[in-house]
A protein has these predicted regions:
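Membrane helix-loop boundary segments at the extracytoplasmic
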Residues: 51-60
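Charged/polar low-complexity intrinsically disordered segments
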Residues: 3-6, 11, 15
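Alpha-helical transmembrane segments of multi-pass inner-membrane proteins
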Residues: 25-51, 73-84, 128-141, 154-167, ...
Length: 393
């Protein structure tokens, strides 16, 4: 072998070793970032909803939850950002300086192609950019960046949410266990709130408050304000119902029963918590589940059973509340009182079960027609209820 051939062979070996080393470093970096993201998701989905300071009740609950969320977000996102910057610097150093222009053009092309393929992520990034621009141009100063006390929805929080979304979208992987843990946390939150409606206060959060106090009717569970609770379930209920539908579609009975029971408690909590927005969240989410499941065999029956279970639960919970004399816990100016004493829950549960049996017995073509009719009828009914409600105000 000539000297030139030996030199070429050595260069090929060196390049192969360097490429293998680079691939190993890339894999370790990805695994590390996935671990950080897993910790972040567990903290946000599991720890944050259940977090409270024993003995403080609802005093400064919003502040303590915000500081926990802010600190966890800054730590996890800071770690991910630092690792990414180091990786980019190393990648730039490995590139030949003579081909830096070509490298930049390739990178620019990749970014444009990536934005086209990830339209949702691009839209979220633009939303964060608009929030930053709004805070910079605002005359409110610190309030535009931080927000008000116990309502820290300024540009900083929006950017933290955008960063959390990007981190979860890139590095979350298939961490289904964390989603199930988040579902369990949401069920615990709902159960604590439902027990409070019966006069039980397992965590002592209502200690010191009496009937007539604003906190007694508006604050519940470990989330506090009923509007905060509705906002929390506007995210968690679609996730919970999607897990339930997936378990039912795959034929996992035990998981379907557990997830179905949890969803029943969450729907009941939204009906009784006092915010009309929470009732709308529950109804719209259930309707979307029925709509998206219309072409999938065997999903409408579990959803109808879940809905009938929620109706029976509402009937029983309302009866127990009246017998225990805890009816005054419900808001006087909301829809919760009407929900608690409505006598049509049993009839609605029977209708759901009858519809389930008829739907199960029909052939596929007639099932589709029945589904479309039920969905359109429910929309007309909802429109009628909304019009009646507006005219009554």
């Amino acid at each position: 072998m000539t000297e030139g051939g030996e030199t070429l062979t050595i260069q090929v070996v060196i390049q192969a070793v360097a490429q293998r080393r680079r691939a190993g470093m890339e894999n370790r970096r990805e695994e590390f970032l996935k671990t950080v993201c897993q910790i972040y998701m567990a903290a946000v989905l599991v720890v944050l909803p259940l977090y409270y300071i024993p003995g403080n009740g609802y005093d400064k609950l919003g502040d303590s939850k915000y500081y926990l969320y802010r600190n966890i977000s800054l730590i996890c996102m800071g770690i991910c950002l630092a690792v990414q910057i180091i990786a980019v610097v190393r990648s730039c150093r490995m590139e030949n300086s003579s081909s830096s222009g070509m490298y930049m053009r390739k990178t620019e092309g990749k970014i444009i192609r990536w934005c086209r393929e990830h339209s949702v992520v691009t839209a979220v990034c633009l939303y964060g950019f608009c929030a930053l621009l709004s805070a910079i141009c605002s005359s409110y100063g610190r309030t535009a960046w931080v927000g008000e006390r116990e309502w820290y929805m300024g540009a900083v929080t929006i950017c933290l949410m955008v960063g959390g979304f990007l981190m979860a979208a890139d590095y979350s992987g298939q961490y289904i266990r964390i989603l199930y843990l988040g579902e369990a946390a949401s069920v615990i939150v709902a159960l604590i709130g439902l027990l409070q409606k019966l006069g039980y206060d397992p965590l002592g959060l209502l200690k010191g408050y009496v009937v007539g106090d604003w906190e007694y009717t508006h604050m519940l569970s470990t989330l506090g304000n009923n509007n905060w609770l509705s906002g929390y379930y506007s995210v968690m209920l679609p996730l919970s119902l999607s897990l339930f539908c997936k378990a039912a579609e795959e034929g996992r009975r035990a998981a379907s029963i557990l997830l179905g029971g949890g969803n029943v408690l969450v729907v009941m909590m939204l009906f009784l918590q006092g915010s009309d927005g929470g009732v709308m969240v529950a109804c719209v989410t259930l309707w979307i589940c029925f709509w998206s499941s219309r072409k999938k065999n065997g999903l409408w029956e579990p959803l109808l059973v879940l809905l009938s279970g929620a109706c029976v639960g509402m009937l029983l919970w309302g009866k127990v509340m009246q017998s225990r004399g805890t009816y005054d816990i419900l808001l006087q100016d909301g829809i919760a009182r009407k929900m608690a004493v409505w006598q049509g829950w049993f009839l609605l549960a029977v209708v759901c079960l009858l519809f389930c049996g008829i739907h199960y017995a029909l052939p596929e073509k007639k099932k589709r027609a029945l589904q479309i009719g039920a969905l359109c009828g429910s929309l007309l009914l909802a429109a009628g209820v909304i019009i009646w409600y507006i005219l009554k105000l």
